[in-house]
Amino acid sequence: MDLMELNLEAEETTQIIVIRLGDEQYGVDIKFIDNIVRMQHITRVPQVPAYLKGVINLRGEVIPVMSVRLKMGLPVDEIDKNSRIIILKLDTHGSIGIIVDQVKEVVTLETASIEKVSYDGKDDRINYIYGIGKCEGGLISLLDFSAVLAE
């Protein structure tokens, strides 16, 4: 296999980290993930929306932390030993941490197997999903953090 074939293969697949929020599984494109850390003390910030939980200090960098559960209209976070903060690096918003119930695994999806989602107007959560990935374990809703952070 030469370099050209490797590049084509890389473009045809996407690595996704599978996370759990409540009873649902979601996927986060690995290219946006900078770090995954255990839960730690989050310093509250006054006069911010409820889904913005506060900030953490990660190796000298102050990073805002949000609850994706609250942003998506799910019940309040249930923090336990499996809870993690995923640090995302986004071009438009810099670094931000998101609280997840569990980081499950990394899966590789074929780009062709990702189906786009069309909005049906019934559930606002669909606005935060850019596609559905098909893998051996079933279907994974792929989170669109540009939409989650847009408001």
Question: Where are the model-predicted features located?
Answer:
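An acidic, low-aromatic, low-complexity terminal/linker signal
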Residues: 1-151
